[in-house]
């Protein structure tokens, strides 16, 4: 069976392909000419139904502005219309030469920033996954023209390794390579994460070519070119972009970490199984009782550790209740100082996930915790 020949000669397939091409051409023409009535006629003619309700009762076709507009100026009559930024990237492009010259940077180099972005989403949903005001972490990496696809692959893999190093589980990540590209891109891929509502985009990696710098140069009338001392020529750099949502990352981490467990003794506990490198409190220092010199020893240990680790001191309630409190906020290590600690200078370290306990000398404590909370160590294991 020759499938290609069948597709090229079968009259039904040829007829349907011709119909698809005609519909696509009409839709494209209507979009370009902003003919909303023609778009509605096309919807009715093709008998398009809502995939959820099955209804054909469509509203009129309307324009949606996905950028927020406002006015700037103290006098309303003279106020100028401005738009809130839908991404942080353009601030980097505008300041590209300022940063390059002041920092004396040579290509390839990157500029990264974290900031707010605003999008007038038609439907904001799925908790903090899709919001109208959100935090972005973006990097624009400037490269020589012709080398962009090499660097695109480099950052695609580097960013994936970074996500894996956070310790949420390799099975929760996957790539989605774009077949249809934005007008500014010649390559694009998403890193998707398995949220409670399915795989969704967490980070985008794009090869933006020289589109942004060229557009700024065109409309500002100022050159946005880099002089390369190695090739002795000036050119507009190409750009590789990595763009990740901080709110989505927060959601990914916490939706993966939250757990309600039933223990062998029948009790239940709420535990936040945050990777140690991400835990806001890495170490809890807990004297067994509030007397007999145990708080004093615990505070001395706290003084030694607090400059290197995020620590919390707690002496209120029973040791069991304190363990549960630390489990609930995701503290990976609890250090207990008991009466024997005064004699042998050893403490008990309790591991959050397994609840196992280990007796270790105080002098080895820093090294044990340091290895567990090091991002460098995590990346080395990937």
Predicted regions located by residue number:
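NTP/phosphate- and nucleic-acid-binding module
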Residues: 1-382
